[in-house]
UniProtKB/Swiss-Prot annotation:
Keywords: Cell membrane, Membrane, Signal. GO terms for molecular function: peptidyl-prolyl cis-trans isomerase activity. It is found in: Cell membrane. Residues 1-20 form the signal peptide. The keyword Membrane applies. InterPro entries: PPIase_dom_sf (IPR046357), PPIase_PpiC (IPR000297), PrsA_foldase (IPR050245), Trigger_fact/SurA_dom_sf (IPR027304). The keyword Signal applies. One of its GO terms (cellular component) is plasma membrane. This is Basic membrane protein. PANTHER family: PEPTIDYL-PROLYL CIS-TRANS ISOMERASE HP_0175-RELATED, PEPTIDYLPROLYL ISOMERASE. Disulfide bonds: none annotated.
Amino acid sequence: MGRYIVPALLCVAGMGFAHAQSALQPIAEVNLFRREPVTLGQIKARISAIEKEMGKKLSTAERRQFMDSLIDEKLFAQAAEKAGIQVTDAEVNQYFNGMLSQQIGRAVTEAEFANYVKEKQNISLDQFMKQQNGMTMAEYKKFLKTQVSTQRYVAQKKADEFRNLKGPEDSQIRSYYELNKQAFFRPDTVKLFLISVPKGSGPAAAKAKAQEFVKKLKSSGVKATADIKSKANGAQAGYSAGEIYLGKTAVTATQLGLTMEALLEIFGMGVGAVSDVNETANDYQCFIVLKKEEAKILTLSDLVEPDKTVSLYEFIKNLLTSQIQQKALEDAIREVSAELRKSGTYKVFLADAELGKVLDW
């Protein structure tokens, strides 16, 4: 049998070489000021990531569009580099942290989000990113860096157009409100002053501390909250305290890890009422009810969030302004892309029919 081993190994090695050769095959080339290939491996990696995120297989025509976007991405990256536009790793991390924060609705660092993912799903942040969009964290940050540099390059090229953008008119703001009025429903809300005492290594002491807070709140009421809150900022305080708003919704109950019945009990308490000590997996909590508001559809003059300063009118104005700016940016990117492609700065090596076959995997 020995005489068959070497040919078999050569066959396996040849298959591996063919695969590598296929992945490294240049499908196109970008050359604004530096020759840079667009390989089949890069195209497959990007399209696989997009298909994973979209949850479906793309058609050959759609894959061609995303291949073209990869060419544009490399053109923009070279154009930004040539123009001296730089994006630091610190800036990329800031954008990345902002995106992570949006996912869980509060400000978090990369390390905090990694702990959150580990706790909830028992996977690493790298694995989480791979599941979400098919890219590792390093790959996604590189992609994000290119996106930021592209936006800055386009903003520089189209500075005059962006400066002359007009915001939404009053009639547009009011029309948007009328058409979307039901979306501005605010459920019954309750404002609590909440105290959390982490169990740490001494759960008995933590519970005793929470019970002391309950006594203090029942004795002095709202007057006690200022002192409790100010002392919570100390490094050795051993607890946190502050105001929170809760909406009477199933989403709120889920976010807090409460049953709907438990949430309704909170809403059944009157203003000034103090809770007993409640135990969770990580801490002991207690609270006093500060304020209650009935459900309503917000008017344009209402505040979007209680205790904040932004009215619904300003909120809609800002929203429409962002939409105008986003559309202007997308239009500008298309225009600059067309300008970059005019000068023979890229080349696709395969004819349409052959390219269609390559993209049909």
